[in-house]
Amino acid sequence: MSNQQNFLDTIQQGYATKGDYLLLGKAMLNHEVFTSADIRLPLRTLNRHGLIAGATGTGKTKTLQHITEGLSDKGIPVLLMDIKGDLSGLAQCGDHNPKLDERCQRMGINFVSESYPVELLTISNEKGARLRATVTEFGPILLSKILELNDTQQGVVAMLFKYCDDNGLPLLDLKDFKKVLQWITNEGAEEIEQQYGKVSSATTSTILRKIIELEQQGAELFFGERSFDVRDLLATDPTTQQGMVHIMRLIDLQDRPKLFATFMLSLLAEIYATFPEVGDAERPKLVIFIDEAHLIFNDASKALLNQIETIIKLIRSKGVGIFFCTQTPTDVPDAILGQLGMKVQHALRAFTAKDRKDIKLTAQNYPETAFYDTETLLTELGIGEALITVLSEKGNPTPLAQTMLCPPKSRMGILTPEEITDLLDQSRLVRKYNEVIDRESAFEMLTQKVQQQTPQTEETKEKPKTKEKEEPSWMSTITKNPMARQLGNTLMREVTRGLLGVLGLKKGR
């Protein structure tokens, strides 16, 4: 048997499926495309997650786009994290061009231009349906992980949530959270100490600094109402029955990784808490693509990485698949990389000694093969080509295959501002979520309580007992005057906020 026939038999047997699948492309050997060697991705294994990696300009985004189209055609909803802004073209039909026609001819497939049902979402100032979550929904554990708090600080946050629950104080946004922090440190300190124990002002100040740091990355836009219902991500187009493609526009978050990580972890936790258990179903209920995944992992604390790892392990039983897109597999922590069933590896570039080391490590992550020199091939792959292995329907890794990938059917480019406006005008989610709600919550309730208590406190306050001590300072003299004290408190609070903001900015990781 010739090497080519042996290769063809290996690929056809390794990628055979009984159930439904997506066609990723056609296998290649020695630059030849085998039109009868389909590279198939079984739908039932999509909840085992995946990785799409490769250097800039090698075709990662187009691969992501093609897989998204295939899922939508199968009626499976998709959520895309669009960091670069080049995925919105899914909403418009693609264009023919000579290179595209030549690729389709080599692969033995027909190109059909098509658009897909798209909803644009945002957690920042980008245009789209706004996603929000309340601080209460976020919860003390997740909030503590994001803020990178120690055990003592986590305990204070948990106590703060308990106090708000016990006293009917809604925690909707960060303004509420900061107000409660100030309350338990100042006016409410005695009440807190009696019910929950003494809280150190140094601890609450540290927590406040970290909240301010998060705010400076734009988190105030994310926390609040109306809360996003993750079940809205499961929609299909009522006319075509295609799965809705929800594109999260994150173009302005590239330099704000903490907010990106906050949003991602919150979303995954909410999906896990909301979706019912389905086990290993014939097809996923939702597939999530996280582009530029290194933004989550680069500066993440160990506690945050552990939280992400746990959610990735558990969420597959909810029928949810998660695919990370990044430049090299080494961007993804080993504990998470080991859980990713599908691996699509585009070309890597070897410019430095570190690059060569990364390529060697990447080659070791793939199944051994008699048909390729994996390490060499990783640097020789053309644009729109990739090394692929997926999980078979039996759960085993398929043979490694150099693959010419199918091209997207939708536009390989961005929408114009006018097209974005038209899309948002038709959006069901924009009408539902872009109303800003600011109902009475902890901030207003505690502000009112302070205002009610202040006059009584000044009128009924006992004179301090006389005792021998040093001559009063100018500060203590001023604070004997109620008006001066109130003015001074306000001034000091504003000065402190400004100072803490600077400290938050300079805090190292």
Regions found by a protein language model. Give the residues of each.
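Conserved P-loop NTPase motor module
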Residues: M1-A16, M28, R130-T136, V344, ...
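Basic- and hydrophobic-enriched, low-structure N-terminal and domain-boundary segments
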Residues: M1-A55, K62-K74, V78-L79, K84-I109, ...
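Conserved ATP-driven motor cores of ASCE-family P-loop NTPases powering translocation/secretion/packaging/pilus
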Residues: S2, H66-T68, A91-I109, T310-N396
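Generic beta-strand/beta-sheet core signal
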Residues: R44, A53-A55, M81, L121-I123, ...
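P-loop NTPase motor domains
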Residues: E69-S72, I76-V78, G85-T310, E380-L381, ...
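Helical "lid/switch" subdomain of P-loop NTPase nucleotide-binding domains
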Residues: I83, A300, L304, T328-V332, ...
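Long amphipathic alpha-helical segments used for membrane anchoring, targeting, substrate engagement
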Residues: E459-R509
